[in-house]
Amino acid sequence: MDKLDGSARLMIVSDLDQTMIDHNDPKNLSLLRFQALWESEFSQDSLLVFSTGRSPISYRGLRTQKPLITPDITIMSVGTVIAYGEEMIHDVGWAEFLSNKWDRDIPERSQGPHKVSFFVDKEGAREVMDSLPETLNRRGLDVKIIFSSGEALDVLPQGAGKGQALLYLLKKFNSDGKPPNSTLVCGDSGNDAELFSVPSVHGVMVSNAQEELLQWYEENARGNPMMIHATERCAAGIMQAIGHFNLGPNVSPRDLEFPYPKLDAIKPADVVVKFYVLYEKWRQGEVQKAPFIIQYLKRITHPNGTTIHPSGRECSLHASIDALSSCYADKQGKKFRVWVDRIVASSIGTINWLVRFDKWEMEGNVRYCCLTTLLLTMKPETEDGFEITHIHKTWLEGYSAGNEHACIL
């Protein structure tokens, strides 16, 4: 991981299903709230790690269904696969390590080279967990058995698992002289228990944690000040833990009332996130239809600033804002969401910033994405402290829209 020159301020290692993603929340509100917080406050100096029981194929499928941002590292198949960045470059060293005393064919696409999974009833799980390791050991295989979600039984190499994968990453960071300043692990089920056993990490069990994890907590971690059982579900519980352990800001830009307060220090990533949160709320009709909102958008954009649409058409920023003013509540009731991903802010001089990011819009099951570049000038003497001078957008291949109305700003 070469994203950071030094140690990560915070590394969050989170399970996905029913931890980061609440499958009982069809609007994905808690997920979007957390991700807005992450992109605005942490993305430039911290690391986000998804640690899931899903196989790489299943994980990629999930990304097409949910509005997920791109993690820095993805741990899949219950800790048996480690991949880096958007390209998901696999860690070959980890795969080679796991191959010791492990041998299997791969007859099913839902299985993995270092994971064999079954569904078993809860009553029979204990008997299988007691007898299977000994049986496999007699065949020269050194394995561990993990039961989670009340039905999933995973057979892994003894050196595998979510906890072992995290220890491997921490060892790599330490050897590079870049240990994270703080690490927060987050989970809801039995296959997450190993994460909480890693030394010196903070941990949060979300409020909807399952019975097997709660039982593990009672037997192994009750009274541990480094671990809490949140009162909030899923991603909201992760934000609760950030505040509880004083790991950084934990109020999402999506939870702020407009007008936004002026900050002492303007962060380019925060500017971008708030800009598009307001854009979404305007089109959803979740803010009042008031002239001062359009006036604010014009105030924070240069009068001669330009925007280049994905078609190549150029127009003034203020003209785009005028177009937006006529779109108030046009997406109300249409499951419309906007989020930004992969923000990279680069200083170009003393007061100017070039900010690159993916800007996503989703309506129902249809989504669009613009690869976006935004030029920002810091103006501490002004009411808002900054000014947007240019926005340039191109369609991400495979995610273009048939009309520019889908990507006004």
UniProtKB/Swiss-Prot annotation:
Q: Name one GO molecular function term.
A: magnesium ion binding
Starting at the broadest rank, the lineage of the source organism is: Eukaryota, Viridiplantae, Streptophyta, Embryophyta, Tracheophyta
Q: Kindly tell me the pathway this chain contributes to.
A: Glycan biosynthesis; sucrose biosynthesis; sucrose from D-fructose 6-phosphate and UDP-alpha-D-glucose: step 2/2
User: Which protein family is it in?
Assistant: Belongs to the sucrose phosphatase family.
**What role does this protein play?**
Catalyzes the final step of sucrose synthesis.
User: Could you tell me the Gene Ontology terms of the biological process aspect for this record?
Assistant: sucrose biosynthetic process
Catalytic reaction annotation: sucrose 6(F)-phosphate + H2O = sucrose + phosphate
> What organism does the UniProt record list as the source?
Oryza sativa subsp. japonica (Rice)
Q: What is its EC number?
A: 3.1.3.24
Q: Which domain of life is it from?
A: Eukaryota
> InterPro entries in the record, alphabetically?
HAD-like_sf, HAD-SF_hydro_IIB, HAD_sf, NTF2-like_dom_sf, SPP-like_dom, SPP_C, Sucrose_Phosphatase, Sucrose_phosphatase_pln/cyn
Would you tell me the protein name for this molecule? Answer: Probable sucrose-phosphatase 3
Task: Please provide the record's keywords in A-Z order.
Answer: Hydrolase, Magnesium
Task: Return the broad EC class.
Answer: hydrolase
